[in-house]
């Protein structure tokens, strides 16, 4: 039970809502559209409802979770959704070609595929960073960069794998901050290992 509690706590701390998609969700709800959420997830609906609420994702009609339904999207979760909702037309939005695309289509549901943050990341020159992220600390840092720079599924990338950073802050967060953070960690570990008492920082004015 303690492990489960800790896992849920960590999920709450690290999950990042995709702002543009949350905005679209809210506009759909505000316009009176019937919106349901469907997910393949090992956590039960009661836990997910709390996480969604904390991220301002409210107003949906139903939450269909494979963990509770004992059915994945591949195994009939979409059919269960249609049976419960009973409408003439359905549109599903997701980021997985098979689970959100093919499975929805086979269930007679129209679908729109968006790119996941990781999917967008892999299309850019940043993708090479995964070869160098070996430690947990480095992978966490990379995850933070992906969550920030590729939060929107509408980020523009070129065929050459280039992307346009929208603000100066993004340059600092995605490029400078990881370098400085890595240096700070290295410096701390070196000081501890060498039992250094004093550190002198040289600075140049101007």
Residue ranges and their predicted role:
Residues 1, 119, 125-189:
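Extracellular glycan-modifying ectodomains
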Residues 17-24, 179-193:
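A short, well-structured juxtamembrane/interface segment
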Residues 36, 40, 196-203:
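Short glycine-rich phosphate-binding loop at a beta-alpha junction
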Residues 36-89:
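Substrate-recognition "cap/lid" segment bordering the active-site pocket of phosphatases
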């Amino acid at each position: 039970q303690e492990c489960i509690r800790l896992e849920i706590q960590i999920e709450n701390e690290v999950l990042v809502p995709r702002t543009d998609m949350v905005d679209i969700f809210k506009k759909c709800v505000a316009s009176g559209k019937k919106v349901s959420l469907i997910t393949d997830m090992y956590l039960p609906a009661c836990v997910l409802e709390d996480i969604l609420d904390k991220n301002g994702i409210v107003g949906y009609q139903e939450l269909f979770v494979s963990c509770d339904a004992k059915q994945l999207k591949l195994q009939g979760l979409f059919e269960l959704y249609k049976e419960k909702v009973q409408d003439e037309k359905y549109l599903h939005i997701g980021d997985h070609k098979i689970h959100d695309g093919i499975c929805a289509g086979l269930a007679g549901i129209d679908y729109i595929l968006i790119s996941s943050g990781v999917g967008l990341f892999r299309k850019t020159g940043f993708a090479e960073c995964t070869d160098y992220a070996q430690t947990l600390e480095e992978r966490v840092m990379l995850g933070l960069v992906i969550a920030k720079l590729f939060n929107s599924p509408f980020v523009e990338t070129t065929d050459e794998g280039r992307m346009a950073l929208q603000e100066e802050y993004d340059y600092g967060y995605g490029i400078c901050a990881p370098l400085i953070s890595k240096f700070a960690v290295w410096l701390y570990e070196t000081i501890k290992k060498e039992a250094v008492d004093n550190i002198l920082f040289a600075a140049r004015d101007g």
